[in-house]
Amino acid sequence: MNRAEKRGFKLYCNTQKGEKIYIVLFDIIDNLATEDSKKIQNRFEIENTGKSIEIAAGYLYKLLLNFLVQKRVEKSIQAKIFRQIEISKILFDSKLYDDALEELAIGKKMAEKYEDDIMQMLICRIEMLQLESLGFVGVSEKELVTKHMKLQAMMKYSRTINQHISLLDILNHRLLYKHYHTIEEEKEMLIDLVLSELHIISNSNYIGFQAEKIHLLFQSAYYIEVGNYISAVRNYKHLIELFKENFHLIQNPPIYYLNAIVGVLESLFAAEIYGEMEHFIGILHGMRQEKYSVDFLLKVSWLEYYYTMMILFQTGNWHKIDEVENSFKECLLKHISCLPLDIQLEYYLLKALILFGKGHLKEAQKNLKPVFSSGKIFQRLPLFRLIRIINLLIIVEMGGDDFVDVEIAALKRNYTGQNLSKTERLILRFIQDYPLPRYSKMKIKIANFYTNKIKIIRKDKLERRVLKYFDFLTFIESKLTGVSFQNLLRNKKMAL
């Protein structure tokens, strides 16, 4: 909750009768700013001897939900449409039939304006039930048939949209949890979804905002995954224009609009076109100034922070990193634990990579400790594998090679169903070569081996998934040539 919502909740509580112990609990939770329930309970028992925290928490939970639901009605279009439906039902039960149908018609216009197919179908069904209860007075057979035809058309459209969304969800799931050796293999495994999506588009008679939005999201996600970043950027820019043309259809918070911005940034970042990313990062910064929910604003802050930091890191501009870090300390970094687990894991990885790149090995290893000490909560996430590899790299850089071979064998065994990428296999081989040889002949031999491997991997677009977080190939080059990792990153940026 933001400050205005907290203030509004306390005003709402003032309208309630009885003893308000739950407000004391609310203040304790707000002031302590901790997720440790024991600390909260101890403070509550100190300030309210003999009072039950369970009862206070239960009542606080109930009041918070009631308050937030009321606030949601003020912002949510769907809640406003539901309100019109309830008004219509009340009027109809009060035998004010004409007024009831008028209120329902207002809700219907709102649903049509915002292209909410579910609400449109619900309103049509309620309208049919009301007309049936009235014996279809004043409604001709032709008008009745027309109304039913509209309802059937809406049901067909809704079914098409749901089929389209299901394809997009399956695509995203495959991209998250399936791994392929080559672009050709990936294209082959995704071809069924691509053909199904094209079939839906070609056989749909309705072309509107929702259908176009889902089509562009699907195509863009596919293009990013197969390495066609130019087409992905083009589609995402088209999607952003579509949102601007239909601004009233953007959700509050604008989740799909945010996805489009992130899609452009991800495509440009993967293609290493860093110069054009500044404009879209600026859009994220502008979104932070709007009055959206706290969770949404926290996610937007994270995205602005993440892409800004990654650009600085990947281009070797490390002297600006601390300044950016300080600017996000209050609005984001103190609240990392409030973000989803995948973002928390991404934060730990980003922080460790920066420390590792700067040579602060002990700090980098310490930064990853929460990940490994949290049990299995992070282990199911795809990024956990990369963190294990980075941790191994930190260990050998610190001069410790105990159990490294055992850990590498365990890592390969754990991911037998998820093929390691070429980059991951190469960096694991490189880790096993520690300590690196000092004699010139062996140095030349090992350098030639890795140089040839690096040339092959750089041509493979599929490897950008791993390299976008940390340029392992440039790191290997820095260790073999003696040139600092930071300088090689800077030189690479100048060559782009």
State each model region's role:
Residues 82, 86-90, 119-122, 126, ...:
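"A position-specific structural signal for the A-helix of alpha-solenoid helical repeats
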Residues 128-144, 150-158, 168-176, 263-273, ...:
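Alpha-helical linker/edge segments of TPR/alpha-solenoid repeat scaffolds
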Residues 58-62, 95-105, 136-148, 180-199, ...:
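Helix-turn-helix repeat elements of alpha-solenoid scaffolds
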